[in-house]
């Protein structure tokens, strides 16, 4: 999914070919004659690079490098579907989970449409975009730029491939030489709205006025909302470098306050008495970290005061480092949610209560944590939507 709003302004539409070395492009500008062209790395034609300096780019990538899936989420994973996708699809993949990127195309309650792409392929596509200096609006599988036919398929020929959009969130690319064999053996083939001259193959073709892939994409700007750049590959916002002396405090603030607000209050906010529960949860969480303080009036303000003291005195550098390491491990492990967090100063240890969508997710989290901590496993309880339990992470320098 993509947060960019569609626009009537000029957009550079680029289709990166399956060879990942060449591309075709079209400048779609309302009211103007469209410019089109091809890009080759050795041609020395600067046209595409010059256009990229003035116009945002919508990049279509080969669906032949994508796999489309539908999955049903467990009840407990509805709010954080991205973390569960890898484990739900693991048995259907031809590659290792760690080598795959999962993009959520659409979610309706527990029903999810997902595109799976090799992480190496995503890196190569992004590197290609960066090499041309593209300001990328979206990275979209090419078949999803075709019009959606509610009663059947839509199709267009692009180079040596036929592209088919088979439903709202899925499609396929077929090499021309294999098209006859594919369609001949397809049972109950849906009507095919065809935007290229139909091949001489027996199929329920419905010929339409000829348009190429980029023309169809230009007429379907809503498809820009479909974007593979999610998770590790999400667009990075440009920002000014942070002065080095502030970084430890910022890391601590983000780790403490993010974990505080996003995780520890999650279950409380689901209750009817949201305000009272949130206030009490804030105080309870604050007391976990500062157990000697009896008078807790404004936890957020008091936390900020402690952070200022940490900056001025250079206090708790090891704790800041460990919180940063823990946050990174959680970010890198799909299907994990931190429920509570406390620090045992006597043992120099972080104490966690976590929930996971599966025992495999929990084991993956534990393995990653062992690279930075000594991990002790406490009580574990199976649940309908996964497993929850307690872990103690002791610093290796203790």
Swiss-Prot record:
Pfam families: GspL_C (PF12693), T2SSL (PF05134). Belongs to the GSP L family. It is found in: Cell inner membrane. Residues 266-398 are periplasmic. The keyword S-adenosyl-L-methionine does not apply. GO terms for cellular component: Gram-negative-bacterium-type cell wall; plasma membrane; type II protein secretion system complex. NCBIfam families: typeII_sec_gspL (TIGR01709). It is a single-pass membrane protein. The lineage of its organism: Bacteria, Pseudomonadati, Pseudomonadota, Gammaproteobacteria, Enterobacterales. GO terms for biological process: protein secretion by the type II secretion system. Inner membrane component of the type II secretion system required for the energy-dependent secretion of extracellular factors such as proteases and toxins from the periplasm. Plays a role in the complex assembly and recruits PulM resulting in a stable complex in the inner membrane. Provides thus a link between the energy-providing PulE protein in the cytoplasm and the rest of the T2SS machinery. Type II secretion system is composed of four main components: the outer membrane complex, the inner membrane complex, the cytoplasmic secretion ATPase and the periplasm-spanning pseudopilus. Forms homodimers. Interacts with PulM/GspM. Interacts with PulE/GspE and PulF/GspF. Keywords: Cell inner membrane, Cell membrane, Membrane, Protein transport, Transmembrane, Transmembrane helix, Transport. This is Type II secretion system protein L. Its main location: membrane. It comes from Klebsiella pneumoniae. InterPro entries: ATPase_NBD, GspL_cyto_dom, GspL_pp_dom, T2SS_protein-GspL. The chain crosses the membrane at residues 249-265. Residues 1-248 are cytoplasmic.
